Amino acid sequence: QLGSEGLGAGNRPERAKAAAEESMEDIKLMLNDGCKMAFITAGMGGGTGTGAAPIIAKTAKEMGILTVGIVTIPFLFEGNRKIDQALDGVEEMSNHVDALLVINNERLRDVYSDFSVMKAFGKADDTLSTAAKSIAEIITLRGTINLDFNDVKTVLKDGGVAIMSTGFGEGEGRVTQAINDALHSPLLNNNDIFNSKKVLFVITYSPNSELMMGEMDEIHEFMSKFGKDVETKWGLYIDESLETKVKFTILATGFGIKDVPGMDSVLNKRTLEEQKRLEEMEEEEQRKDERRSDFYGPNILKN
C-alpha cells in the first residue's frame, strides 16, 4: 500500500506521487535487501501508475539498482485525455530508469482483435509480466551458451527506450522464421531493430530437435545486419517443451523517447504550448510596461 489511506489515486497522478513520497522509507526498505535489478511495471494513464511508478523508479536507481520500467499505454477507445496523461507518465518515467519498455495496448488490439474487452485488458497485463519474466529468465536459466546478469546489465544500463519481442519457427528455415516472426511483432512499435545501440538475443531449442550447424549460419546472417558499433550479446538455451520449434527472443536498447508511438505529437504540442506561453508572457510584460509608462512617464522603462 502506498500512503496511509489506501483509497486509490482517483485518476490523479499527483495524489499517487504524494502517496509514494509518503511511503518512501517503506519503498527503500523493500529494495534494500541486496536487490540488483528492479522491474517497475505499471499501466500508464490512470493515477497510481502514472504518478507513483516514476517515484519508485527514481528511488531504485538512486540506490544503484539496475532499474527497468515496463509500462502499458492505453487503447485508443480509452480517450485522448487518458492517452495524453499516459504519455506524460512515460516521459517522466524515462527520466528515472535505465531502460523503459513501452507496450502499446492498441498494438495488442491489432493482434487480438477477436478478444473481449476484459480479455484484452488481461492480455495487456500478461504482456507486462511476460516481458519481466523473459528478461529474468535470461539470467536465471541455464543454457548451452549462457548469458549472465552482467550481460543483461550491459544492454540495459542507461539503455533509454527498449524494445523486446519473441518469435517462433518450425520446419525448414525455422531459425529464420523465428527471427522474422520476432521482427514483425507489433510490440516493436514500428521501430527498426537495426537502429538500436545495444542488442541481446536468445535462441531456444529442444534437445529433441537439436540446433544444427547449418542453422547457425542463419543466426550469423542476422547478426551481420547490425552496424559494427552495435554491441551484441547472444545465448543458446534449452526448453524441452518446444519439441521441434525454435524460439527467438530479442531485447534491444538505445532508442529515444520520441520513438514511443504518439510521443512526437505530445512533444510537439508541448513545444507549441511553451511557445504560446512565452508569447503570452511577453505580451503581459509589454502591457505592464505600458501601464507603468502611463502613470510614471516613458523614462520609467529605462530604470
Regions of interest found by a model, annotated:
Residues 1-303:
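Tubulin/FtsZ superfamily GTPase core signature
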